[in-house]
């Protein structure tokens, strides 16, 4: 959320599943965030550079490659945004790979709206905390 008078926080969501995108957009906009959407790895990486979001939420499995490329692109920025990785295929290996690439929070799909909001707020507040949630 934004302090009074401040510009809305910018959240880039990278996911190819329409239902999840609609949920992210509705929830985040309702809570005052400006939402930017990408549906492929390539578009996600380009949006990280072009839009300079405050937060990136990226699925791991994208139609043209790994969401880890989006994570790496985000974390390589001069002022890197926090990154939440989401996946419908959670495992110890995927969690470790996401955190090693620079994700700050790892969420397993499906998750409750309250869990996503808590992760978003934590990421924007703490920046570099590393957490796992389900």
Tell where the protein language model's regions lie, with residue ranges.
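Two-component/phosphorelay signaling modules centered on CheY-like receiver
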Residues: 18-36
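Acidic catalytic/metal-coordinating carboxylates
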Residues: 40-43, 66-69
């Amino acid at each position: 959320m934004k302090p009074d008078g401040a510009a809305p926080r910018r959240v880039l969501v990278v996911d190819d599943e329409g239902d999840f995108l609609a949920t992210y957009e509705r929830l985040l906009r309702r809570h005052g965030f400006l939402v930017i959407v990408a549906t492929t790895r390539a578009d996600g990486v380009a949006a990280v550079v072009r839009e300079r979001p405050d937060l990136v939420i990226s699925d791991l499995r994208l139609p043209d490659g790994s969401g880890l490329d989006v994570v790496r692109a985000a974390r390589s920025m001069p002022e890197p945004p926090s990154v939440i990785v989401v996946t419908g295929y959670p495992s110890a290996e995927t969690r470790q790979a996401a955190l090693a690439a620079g994700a700050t929070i790892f969420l397993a799909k499906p998750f409750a709206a309250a869990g996503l909001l808590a992760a978003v707020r934590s990421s924007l507040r703490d920046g570099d905390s590393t957490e796992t949630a389900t």
